[in-house]
Amino acid sequence: MEASLHFPIDASLRAAVAVISAGAFYLLNLVIYRLFLSPLAKFPGPKLAAVTSWYELYYDLVHKGKYLFEIEKMHDKYGPIVRINPFELSIRDSEYYDELYVAGSVRPTDRYEAFVEGIVDFKGSHIATIEHDLHRKRRKPLDPYFSRLGVSRLEPMLGELTEKLIVNRFESFKRTGKVVRLDHAFTAYSGDVINRLCMDDPPDVLVDDPEFSPWWYNMFHNGIATLPLFMGLPWLIHVVRLIPVSILAKLDPGTQTFNKFKMMCDDHLRVAKREKAAQGSKDTSMMDARPTIFRHLLNSDLPPSELTDDLLSKEAQVLIGTGTITTAGSLCFICYHIVVNPAIKKRLQEDLKLIMANYPAKKPTWAELETATYLQAVIKEGLRLSFGTMHRRTRVSPKQPLQFRQWTIPAGVPVGMSAYYAHRDPSVFPRPDEFLPERWLSNVTPEMSRNYVPFSRGSRRCLGMNLAYAEINHVIATLFRPGGPDFKLYETSEKDVKPAHDLIVPLPSLESKGFRVIFR
């Protein structure tokens, strides 16, 4: 009897010991493989990073987007190529940039699967497409829409929205003493621009809001803060999807805001599909006017399988998200440095005197604004130091190995480089952390052009590059034209605009209370 009572306990203990032993044996073998047998074992870097992705997760989750700066220290210690996690390499050598980020005619380039898994719910959009050929198929119809010619068709709309923001809204704050958050204002402006691309004549609900729709700004910033968690632990996404929306809304009120955002995208899509159904056959003449992005896609050569409601809605979410936050951040950074540097502001206004003389009766085009050389230097320097995207842009060569100096990188290995390193290379940009537009006015070296990559390069270069340039040109020229609205900073310093956290997109200090000004 006594022996029978002990038997289950002994069996349970043995089972527990067996499970623990098996787990320990597996982990030991995994460590040995990653340190000594992996195809990446030959590459330099800290052993802990080679063993576990938790090393990266610690810096990005606990320290909120600081792994980029830890990688910089790795490069300082180990050299131009380092292993930054068990699966991925980082290169800091701008001469190699055009070898990694190539056109599709040179070789196919895949997206890193872990990145796609980590951006939550955008699989199926062009930006979250892993495989090269499928990405090319999905992006091809979008390229003409966002080309220089395509963006030129949007300029009347850009001019109208810019006038509404700066003349109607900003100038109404003169001598009121009201504290205005320009980060909210620019995020609302960029959001309304993309909304106009998605739907004919939508209400400009973001810019028209008395406080510039802080919910819109908060939705993106709160969502961005979760990215390190999902990129480090992508399986969590599948768990979250199992939770009913009603419960998620109670756990995280921000979910309701995101659902509002998704519903807005779905509304845009429904309008476009109704138009398509009423239209019947293709009407290529719509490109002569300003088509919405959905109308453009629905009249493209994409097969029906690529035009489902789910895929088109995700494409809209990506376009609205990526077209909003980075442009707004760059505008904040540029405006701050113009305001705190009176000499820069004075020279910029001199540069704009003739081209903006008859504004708003005559609104200059983007092409005309490009003739204002100092304006272009200010914008270029602003994009250099706001980086576009700080996060390493990881690429995979699926079929052929890559050669970097004496290292052969096996096919299929993810490799990333960052604009943060290229834009701050002191051998190319002396005094790299200083805002010096003059560096772009004369003696611009080939190395400066090579290292300037705010929108990346190659087959996966930023789709919205031309639109971003056009928006920034219109806003900066209109805001700082002679006779434009005058404002002063309110309890704002460089930490409120300077990128300090790499959360896929660069964010300033998370302690910031915003880019605040008072119009005089």
From Swiss-Prot:
* Purpose: Cytochrome P450 monooxygenase; part of the gene cluster that mediates the biosynthesis of the sesterterpenes ophiobolins, fungal phytotoxins with potential anti-cancer activities. The first step of the pathway is performed by the sesterterpene synthase oblA that possesses both prenyl transferase and terpene cyclase activity, converting isopentenyl diphosphate and dimethylallyl diphosphate into geranylfarnesyl diphosphate (GFPP) and further converting GFPP into ophiobolin F, respectively. Other sesterterpenoids (C(25) terpenoids) are found as minor products of oblA.
Principal localization?
A: membrane
Entry cofactors: heme
For molecular function, the Gene Ontology terms on record are: heme binding; iron ion binding; monooxygenase activity; oxidoreductase activity, acting on paired donors, with incorporation or reduction of molecular oxygen
Gene Ontology biological process:
terpenoid biosynthetic process
Q: Which Pfam family would be a valid example here?
A: p450
> Pathway involvement?
Secondary metabolite biosynthesis; terpenoid biosynthesis
**Which keywords does the record carry?**
Heme, Iron, Membrane, Metal-binding, Monooxygenase, Oxidoreductase, Transmembrane, Transmembrane helix
Protein's name according to its UniProt entry:
Cytochrome P450 monooxygenase oblB
Q: Which family does it belong to?
A: Belongs to the cytochrome P450 family.
This protein's species is Aspergillus clavatus (strain ATCC 1007 / CBS 513.65 / DSM 816 / NCTC 3887 / NRRL 1 / QM 1276 / 107)
Q: How does it sit in the membrane?
A: Multi-pass membrane protein
Q: Which GO terms describe its cellular component?
A: membrane
* Cellular compartments annotated: Membrane
Gene label: oblB
Spans through the membrane: 17-37, 229-249, 320-340
Where, by residue number, does heme bind?
Answer: C462
Task: Cite the EC number.
Answer: 1.-.-.-
